[in-house]
């Protein structure tokens, strides 16, 4: 083969390699539509995921200094557990059923699987997405109704859980919904992060989803409570949102450092 043909073949291989991720993503989107529309498939997957999460939870040894939501409950603390998208998969274990009244889950079809897994763990779900203040789209997604429902659960003396950042929005940037819940309920937000020494980060996903593996070390970090005054104005709400963003980042970095031996 002459040099020109070799160059052409090389370029074709490079184009093919570049196209594969996009083709794979497109294929997954087509398959996913059928999965989320099938109640039977969703139920089976939910049970498999729930079993996997229990395996991860029970086979990872907590490192020294690891926190616990159960310990906070025993001390009489109540509030809103907050985590980032991509690090929320262990929520059913971190926020134990019986103590956690409800977790907000997106109204999207994809989130139906998350809701099923939470319900298998004994945690009720309220469907909605919390966006920024005066976000009409958030209201249309049931965010306002879900926030009212979460407030009622908090009024009963139970914990609730929310994913702080907005689905398919800017990752690791807290939305205003969770801050609003803290203001109207009078209950603080607790930044929560979980990490294991054996894990896989899906770099191509929008939220850098973390898959935790069993048989390693685990750490939970529960940050200091973040209070929002009932009369907080727009500037105070934004300050609380930015504070929560920073504290969730800090908790996530701390949990990773603890299991990686860098604490």
Give, region by region, the residue ranges found by the protein language model:
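Catalytic-site beta-strand/loop segments enriched in glycine and acidic/polar residues
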Residues: 146-181, 185
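A cross-family acyltransferase "interaction/gating" segment
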Residues: 172-233
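Amphipathic coiled-coil/heptad-repeat helices and related helical stalk/stem segments
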Residues: 65, 87, 143-147, 174-175
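Solvent-exposed loop/turn segments at secondary-structure junctions
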Residues: 88, 110, 167-170
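Structural motif
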Residues: 80-82, 104, 161-163
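Membrane-interfacial amphipathic helices and adjacent loop/beta segments
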Residues: 43-64, 102-145, 151
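Membrane-anchoring hydrophobic helices of lipid-metabolizing enzymes
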Residues: 2-99, 122-124, 239, 246-263
